[in-house]
Amino acid sequence: STNGMGGCIWDWVDQAIVSYEDQKAGNLKVNGYNKYRNGNDYPQAPHQGNFVNNGIITADRQPTGKLAEVKRIYQYIKFGTLNKTAKTFTLTNKYEAIDLEGMMLNWQLLMDGAVVEEGSTTLPSIASGKSQSIGINYGDVSGEGEYLLNVAICLPEATSWAEAGHAIANTQYAISQRTALPQADVNAGTPLTLTKSGTTYTIEGENISMKVNTSKGITAWKQGGISVLPVDSETSASPTYSNYRWIENDAPYGTDPYYETGNGISSRTFTVKANDDNSAVTITENASGSRCDYKFVYTVNRDGTVDLDAQYTVTGSNLRRIGMLMQFNPELSMTRYYARGPLDNTIDRKQGSDLGIYDLPVSAFHVDYVRPQT
């Protein structure tokens, strides 16, 4: 055959359930997560294990980044290339029996993620299978910065399945790209000071202060006077090696070695040294363990930035994944960023995630996938 087909969605929803027994007992959470069951919980019946937990929404019907991607790719209104000189593009109606006449076209002009102009117009008649050139008379885009044009085709009135204003098709055009950001000047600011009292070193600079214990690691860290670490950081503050990650939901099943939760690290030592002109302080952590040894080298720069170089050496046969674990001050609960969002996206799943400025709680960055991506 000369034809091929791909990108099909096997399942709309993760096929996991809450059992009757758990509902009756009120046993709906495990370690803070929803307790769902899959085929593995019913060995007496034919099943496919966890395989059918591959939907684009979660078992409790919450959207995921996969849903945003599918919606953008499947949408039945196609946007042609933007003619930046004429400020026009072509709309093609892929619906079988719907005319686009009366649909609302809403647009926003963004510069570096911020809305600088917006407008709305009503679409003319565009019959099924037909195309129409559409013009948007947005303003000046000659300033420095990255200009983007967001376009959405929206319902003018509520329907039985969506409210008025619901977007049935979207796109984002890049009108211009911003120039490269200036490289950070790590030597900005006054030289750092390094002092020692007992087993604790103190690093001080204009924008940073840090305490490092030679047996515990980093126990205090402030940026601009704000604590980066939790208050009880005396016990575990430094980033540490973590391999607590396995295919089926990090489940600690019995004594199976693949589900051990420890990292196998038996010793950690820390050394601290300033360079000759106090423009940087280096913190070196060496650790040994049954699964791997590692060496972390932190470079604290006078401008307040911290670079971390991590090197791992495998020592055992059951090393599954290499990662790092660090806890932050819980008061640092909000983020603002200029990138793709607002749902999770990856380099090969980003068409449904537009560039913009997003203000989100840290909790929004956690997605309860039934099965971790592997």
Task: Identify the meaning behind each predicted range.
Residues 1-86, 95-101, 106-115:
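Extended substrate-binding grooves/exosites of carbohydrate-active enzymes
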Residues 7, 70, 91, 151, ...:
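Conserved, mostly hydrophobic/aromatic
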Residues 91-97, 314:
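Asparagine-centered strand-capping/turn motif at beta-strand->loop junctions
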Residues 104, 146-150, 307:
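Short, conserved beta-strand segments of beta-strand-rich sandwich/propeller modules, principally
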Residues 110-144:
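Intrinsically disordered, low-complexity Pro/Gly/Ser/Thr-rich segments with frequent PxxP/GP/PP motifs
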Residues 137-144, 159, 174-374:
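Beta-strand/loop-rich accessory regions of lumenal/periplasmic or secreted enzymes
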Residues 153-162:
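Short acidic/polar inter-strand loop motif in beta-rich domains
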